[in-house]
Every structure is written in structure tokens, then in C-alpha cells.
Amino acid sequence: MPAMECVAKKFLKLPNIQKYEVSALTEYGFVAAIEMDDGFEFKIHVYTMQKSYPSSVMQLLEKRGKDKGDCVLVSPYISKRTADICEKNGVGYFDYAGNCWFVGHSIYLSERGNKNLSPERSIASTSIFEQSAVISSLILRELFADINKVWRLKHLSETVKCSIGQVSKVMDFLIKNAWAEKSAEGYYISEPELLLKEWSKTYGKKTVPTYLCYSLDNPSVLEGKLSDLKRDMGIDYYLTGFSGGVRYAPVVRYNKVHVYIAPEDMLEAVAYLGLKEVDSGANVMIFSLENDSYKKDSRIIGEDMVVSPLQVYLDSMQIKGRGEEIAEAVLLKEILK
């Protein structure tokens, strides 16, 4: 049995372990008895899971108090989120790739970085955060419009104008990963910051079609010309990245402009603004406004159209340098308020 083997192998490699043996099989896994070289004996209660969702670990923690002895989770694949929950709560873990963590009884086991050949990422887990998943994106954006709001599935589906099935799929995934919870009143986001960080990782794996341009104007002058572009040509634009972020939280100085413009307006906008397309050294990034989710909850700040704090966060997390700094500032000031 792989679960038994991967735990036994790690413990028996330790020089201070005299004996390790499985003493009982249980409905959840097995119990192993361990004897150290000084004669001290203890037991570990090993829970085996084919899929170790963070929510499953939360349930394991509830059972933990009923068992006398140390608690250990074994699964083919253990995500970083699951590992963090285990470590925070003193639960050991082992996966089939050899990654592990166990602390107790003068024992410290820790091994990370072994690549799992078949990481547990279902189609649903990847598609929910991808830029092409427009409906899922709209559902998530509605949830983040007010992270303190509790939703009924029917109300959320009506608000987003999608099926209850689509909403249910998203909420089930969030609950499995312990980012959302269900109460008697409905569903709500319980770990907004962790959820956003995971979303931003997947979001950044696909690059939005971008015009890389150079302008002789400084950012403030160019952003003023964008306002003129709207007035003179009727072309909508939405500031994001540094340009959008400082409108919400002016914590960084910047020399690059980030803006969304519809793909059909790109060439006309570039010509009006007097920009030159370049392969390197760009100080203007024009992102293609491919779908309406990017501009959901956008607002007018001063004379400029600015994407939502959520979109600023997602875009800024992909910017090298001080992008994460502006993203974090917007997160704290506008999203987690």
C-alpha cells in the first residue's frame, strides 16, 4: 500500500527510530506504533485521502481531538494550501512524491520540492480562474464586490445572469479549497486574500494581447491625452496597473502607463496618442479589452475611467518590480475594507 510505504520509509530513515510498525487498520487509514532508541513509544493516526482538499483537512482537524496520538495525512498529492493548513495546526503530512512534514517527540521531518508526476488539478480547478472562463470570472467578481455579503445561489445567479448550476460549480470549488463557507444564511467568502493570491497565479499564466508602445510624454501627460481620446474620438479606455492603482492607493511612483482599450480601437488610439510600437523599452502597455469582465465595476476617478480594485490587483500582480506593492495596497484599502 503506497500510503503505508511512504510513511514507513521516512521514519525508518531516521537514526533515532528503533522500530516502526502498523499496529491497526482503521476506517480512515491506519495506526502506526513507533519506538525510539531511548525506549520512548508513541502512535500516529494516519488518515489516507485520495484527494486532500483543504476542506477535507478542516474536517480531519475536527476528528483529531477524538484520537489519542499524533495525526498524519497521506495523499498522492498535497497542495501548498493543504500543507500550510496542516503545518499551522500541527498535522503531519506525506505525499507519494516524497514531500513530507512531521514535528513531535524530538523528531523533525521536512522535505519539499519533489515534483509530483500527476498533481491534483482537476479541469474545474484550473478553468475557474482562467481569463477565458468569463462566467466564473463574473461570479467571483460579484462575490468580491462586497466580501462581507452572504449569498443565496439563486440570488447570485440572477445578479450575474447565469444558471444556478454555474454558480453552484464555482461555490463548490471554493468550499473544497476552504476559501468559502456555507452557513444557514447562505454562502460567503471566508479567505478572500488567499483566494485572490491563487486566482492571480492562474490569471497570470495567460497573457492578454498587448500593444507595447513608447511615448515621449510622461505618464501624467499621456493619461491626460487618454481623456482627450475619449472626448475627441469617443474611444473608451480603462486605466489599470500602476496607472489605475495609484488612483486607489497612491503608494508608488511610476513611469509606465497601463490601460485597457477595445481591440477594434487599438490602431486608432495608438495613432491619436502618437505612440510608437516597440519590441523593448515600452513605457505604455495597451491591453486588449477582450471581454466585459475586465471592466466590471469600473469607475470614474477624477476625469479618468479606472478598472475595479479587483482588476487592478490581478493586473498589478503580474507586473515586475513594484507591481505587488501596489496590488497589496489596493487589496488592503479597497478590497478587504
Predicted segments with their positions:
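C-terminal regulatory/effector modules of DNA-binding transcriptional regulators
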Residues: 24-29, 35-36, 154, 279-337
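Short alpha-helical segments that sit at the start of domains
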Residues: 110-140
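Loop-centered beta-sheet repeat module
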Residues: 139-199
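Charged, structured surface patches that assemble and position nucleic-acid processing machinery
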Residues: 90-102
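A compositional/biophysical signature of low hydrophobicity enriched in polar/charged and small residues
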Residues: 196, 202-208
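Short gly/ser-rich loop at a beta-strand->alpha-helix junction or flexible surface loop bordering the NTP-binding
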Residues: 206-292
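DNA-contacting interfaces and partner/effector-binding or oligomerization modules
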Residues: 1-91
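Short, charged, surface-exposed secondary-structure boundary motifs
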Residues: 103-107
